[in-house]
Amino acid sequence: MARAFLFVLDSFGIGNAPDAEAFGDLGADTLGHIAEFCAAGAADRAGLREGPLHLPNMSALGLMHAARLATGRLPAGMALPERVYGIYGAASEVSRGKDTPSGHWEIAGTPVTFDWGYFPAEGDAFPPELVEAICREGDVPGILGNCHASGTDIIARHGEEHMRSGKPICYTSSDSVFQIAAHEQTFGLERLLNLCEVVRRLVDDYNIGRVIARPFVGSDPGSFTRTGNRRDYSVLPPEPTVLDRLQEAGRTVHAIGKIGDIFAHQGVTRLTKANGNMALFDASLEAIEEAEDGALVFTNFVDFDMLYGHRRDVSGYAAALEAFDARLPDLDRRLKPGDMVILTADHGCDPTWRGTDHTRERVPVLMFGPTLRSRSFGIADSFAHIGETVARHLGIGVGPHGRSLI
């Protein structure tokens, strides 16, 4: 029996999606613009990285071919490898948002065909009656922020007042999200998580996709740092995903990183938390060593999005891609006959783009394993085909929204 390993490089888009203009993202290209900056020397950073973007392993799996499919051109400074060792292509999203749950649920075979609720960008983000209910039921003296913001910026702006007053920092973005930042010592991590559970219940009436706990430490704006104790409180997917179908078939689903939170822990058999891309990679390798026949190992590599995409850090994003790429031989050595690895993404977050939000992009789909022969599948018209490829590979029924790419 086969095994499948699904790795989501969070926000690693490869060129604007066909409907990008409707999202204000026409021209966005996470990979292309990172490569362009690297080729021009604009992503050099002392002690971190320098020179053209160097992704030899993903290139050998078809990444540059996929990028050319998505955009019609090669990323700057990049060349096609002499040989490709995997099945490759690009995929466009059909879900109506460019957020994390929409992307992941669609990858798992369940597109989001409804509209999420969003909070306004002008004025106070949250309705007065919601703020009042949060203060009353969450037992807090008020809130700070109440706006669209970058997480690191708003913590720097309000962190000291939060520590003095005990008021949590509440903010949102262009995603369907309610984020709460609080100090782990002065406010307390457990209290923050309890507050998020209260808010999760309260924002259900507003059709908000996620409530996110954003704990931080430090004593002043210069030392405030978000910790690895982030927690996402998502609603349930609108219908069963490939995770549910695997679980019903008696298979093991290993959820690593924030995968469990994204799926509200539905369809998850084993949960592993880790902080940082390299720790997530290590945890994935450990799960692969343990995974039995028929199992799925599903990992989200969040640093690309959280640390570099939203913060518009081109050098950091490039270095993170290069570090991930360098680990792929460690993965390849652990594969057995019948194993399949899929590298993909859930949306874009172009670090050269205006603002701090996600970008509507096509994503790469790179599939490899000891028994897979190299070819292109072209451009898939839904991320759902990724999940159904997993379903077919693992020998369970294909769902209603996609088809296998192999």
Curated annotation (Swiss-Prot):
Residues that coordinate or bind Mn(2+) 1: D10, D346, H347
Catalysed conversion reaction: 2-deoxy-alpha-D-ribose 1-phosphate = 2-deoxy-D-ribose 5-phosphate; alpha-D-ribose 1-phosphate = D-ribose 5-phosphate
UniProt entry keywords in alphabetical sequence: Cytoplasm, Isomerase, Manganese, Metal-binding
The enzyme's E.C. designation: 5.4.2.7
Gene Ontology cellular-component annotations: cytosol
Claim: Coiled coil is one of the keywords in the record: no
Species, as recorded: Rhizobium meliloti (strain 1021)
Pfam families from the UniProt entry: Metalloenzyme (PF01676)
Family: Belongs to the phosphopentomutase family.
Protein name: Phosphopentomutase
Cofactor note as given: Binds 2 manganese ions.
Gene name per UniProt: deoB
